[in-house]
Amino acid sequence: MSAQPSNNTAPDLVNIEVDGVAMQVPKGAMIIHATDKARIPVPRFCYHEKLPIAANCRMCLVDVEKAPKPVPACATPVMEGMKIRTRSERALNSQRNVMEFLLINHPLDCPVCDQGGECELQDVAMGYGRSVSRFVERKRVVADEDIGPLIATDMTRCIHCTRCVRFMSEIAGTSELGGIGRGEATEIGTYIGKSIESELGGNIIDVCPVGALTNKPFRFKARAWELIARESIGYHDALGSNLFLHTRRGEVLRTVPRDNEAINENWLSDRDRYSHEGLVASDRATQPMIRGVDGELKPASWEEAIRFVADGLKRVEQAHGGDQIAALVAPMASCEEGFLLAELLRGLGSRNIDHRLRVVDAVDRNAGATFERPLADIEKAGAILLVGSNPRLDQPLLGHRVRKAWKRGATIDAVNPVGFDFHFETRAARVVEPWAMLDELAAIAKAAVDAAGVAAGPEVADWIANAKVEEVHRAMAKRLADASNSVLLFGDFAVQHPAASLLRALARLLAKATNTAFNELASGANGIGLARVGVVPGEGGAGAAQILAQPRKALVTWHAGSQDTLRSKSYDAARSGADFHVYIGAYACNGVKRTAHAVLPIGLVPEIDGTYVNVDGIVQTVAAGAKLPGEARAGWRVLRALGEALGFSQFDFTELTEVRARISDRLATPVPAATDVATPKMPTGLIRIATVPAYKSDAVVRRAAALQATPLAHAPQIALNPADFLAAGLSAGGKARVSDGTDSIELPAVADARVPAGAAWIELGHAETALLAPNGAGLTVTGA
């Protein structure tokens, strides 16, 4: 006797029965949602919980009472009183028949297919397939298309589920894949034989239920059952995406997403997916080195190196005072590493430490607060204002949330230095040179202040009073004020703006006047955590910009390279001019070998235990997933040894858990900021726009070979507005000579209508642009 559904049904629920089990499910839900909720297995290929329904594989056919034929569970809404059978003879026969059709053209590649052992088709075929095929005709063969360095194709294996097509269209927003042809002659491809360029494209590997799309750098390296999955997080932006490191014998062979709805859902950016290649590089530091009396760097034991560094730092402190010691820390450092390094410097009498290596203006001492509206809620926003933000490339999975909000009807406006290529539409985009962004934001803030009757603080009062408000500014302010759950995203470029403190004050005033959440993107992967444990200047201390402008006698650089700073030339001068330079990091590049008096090799995020804080303030602790190379050690162990060698009592610990206990309270405590703002000094000439390319963001990414072979990792160039391009006497395909008044370089020049008049777009992160002045500087451009 079948179970009877309850009559006490809520208005938004319906009573159904699945395989004799009564249940209540929401109106409008599909049958497959009900079976999944009841943990009743129904085979499927085209269905994916995050993708639009297609119902084209027909594998999920089920038997519904009174229905004339089996129906697809993924595309059939439940109805009151519906009785569904997933294991009836009709349902099972239908599923077996569909399985037979799907296998007709599928090659017997399992022994050499990278998907073997984790293949959905394999798994379902074991339960629903025939042991011997009845098909004796010639199988279909499809030529493979080269779609770039990240994704390998074996399209003869494709079963036309279209998951990849729907992902690229609906999630990535690029529509780079589609089906061509009819029936079994259908082929999935890029239409014109081009590379997949989306920053999220690698996710089609995960959604593909067969081995048609696989990880190209991982190809033929290992079988699924040889790998150990280690939980970790992404460390190339401040989201902290959850992921698994798949390792074999301590080596990371691939990276895949780990589900976390609050952060990355079940997606992963290509930067996080493929950056593990950078762990193995020709310049990886694998043993301690110290500079001998002959001026040459030579290998040393850890005991010798620690004593050498301790003596060198103590010598500078005794001769010149603690203020002549400084540290520059890459924002990928863990909270434990940052805390111990800050303690080490304080023990030496120094407050000169910073992780904000690309920040020009830090007079308000802002070190990155957590989001006022959580990451997961951004997709529910009614209006979004982007200020100096390109979330699509800077934080790809934040860009995905913004796109979801737009698809739900949110209005998106922007105040940006470049007309970035978004995968959503903007209602109003004010694209102006960096200094003019202050005027634009002041005008929007004035419109909001006037409408809300909010008083401007003294730090921005003059800017609000003198702002020239146009109708477009009023409309932008009104959209924020009228919308529910409006969000202002203060992006990477805004944080690195030459007058970031003033821009931030205007943005906060606008957010206050419109009841909008102010969400600022912290510097790097762990900027919030590092700020909370003290990796910012103490009272009277110097930040990164000051350290580079006024070099100290002793400099400690932690994972930091010249391309990670606001101006490579200044960084090189600071480390070469120091009497004692200690590099503690993973890569002993030529620049490090030229200037460092000591090199102490340490592990990167996948190789160490550490704690990190993301934009929502979520504290995430990870364990080492990969083996440390050579004699490299975890950073906290190196600092403990240094602290002991210097005789500091606070380094009397043996376990990392003891350090975590010391910092646990601080990780939940925001860093107070000041209300000081910079006084803008407008330069002359074309204003430099210095954004950070997606695949040049840090030292690990720059060494990931597959990422560097993608279209997003293009060569350095100067892009000018077409009018400025002609005025400078430049020609298509030619080069430009760019000067900042002190240094000059030659770069390929292009005319780009996305660049505003009066500006020159030259990206950071390239060795070729190292000499130029930083963001917001005035440049002179002529034909080369």
Residue ranges and their predicted role:
Residues 2, 42, 47, 342, ...:
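A cross-kingdom feature strongest in bacterial/archaeal respiratory oxidoreductases
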Residues 184-185, 221-228, 330-333, 361-362, ...:
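A glycine-rich phosphate-binding loop feature that marks nucleotide/adenosyl-phosphate handling sites
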Residues 215-218, 320-325, 454-460, 517-521, ...:
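Flexible, glycine/charged-enriched surface loops at secondary-structure junctions
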Residues 249-266, 271-281, 285-292, 301, ...:
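Long hydrophobic segments that form regular secondary structure
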